[in-house]
Amino acid sequence: MYSKFETEIVVRPSDIDYNGHVHQSVYLDYLLFARVDQMKRCYKVPIEEFFKRGFSWATKSTTIEYKRPLFMDETITVRTWVKEIKKMTVKVCFQLLKDSGKIAAQGHSIYVLINSKTGKPVAIPEAIIEKYSI
């Protein structure tokens, strides 16, 4: 079992589409912002640490179910947790929660650790697996 972490984000005017709510593509921006924040703040492994070691994370796939719209000036909570770690991939589940606590969107992403020079997948070092196993 892995811990769940949360990051709060305030919806900006630039996030709003012509329907008056957050555009669907912005949900991915929120997820990215939250993951980078949580890697540094919660896991104590900032993304820059991966870059220094010659690694990077690439998104293999993301699945999102949109349930409720988000609106300007709403403070949302992005909750994420590691669901599964395999040899070269990490499955991260997420929820975007409205002010009310109701789920606005949910889903998961699969990330692949890659060698920054070759662009090829590499095995996740045991030290990283240990950091994520909190």
Where do the PLM segments sit?
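Hot-dog-fold acyl-thioester-processing enzymes
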Residues: 1-60, 114-134
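HotDog/MaoC-like acyl-thioester-processing domains
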Residues: 3-7, 71-72, 83-134
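Conserved beta-strand segments that form the floor/walls of ligand-binding pockets within enzyme
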Residues: 10, 23, 65, 77, ...
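Hydrophobic beta-strand-centered segment that forms part of the acyl-chain substrate-binding groove
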Residues: 39-84, 89-90, 104
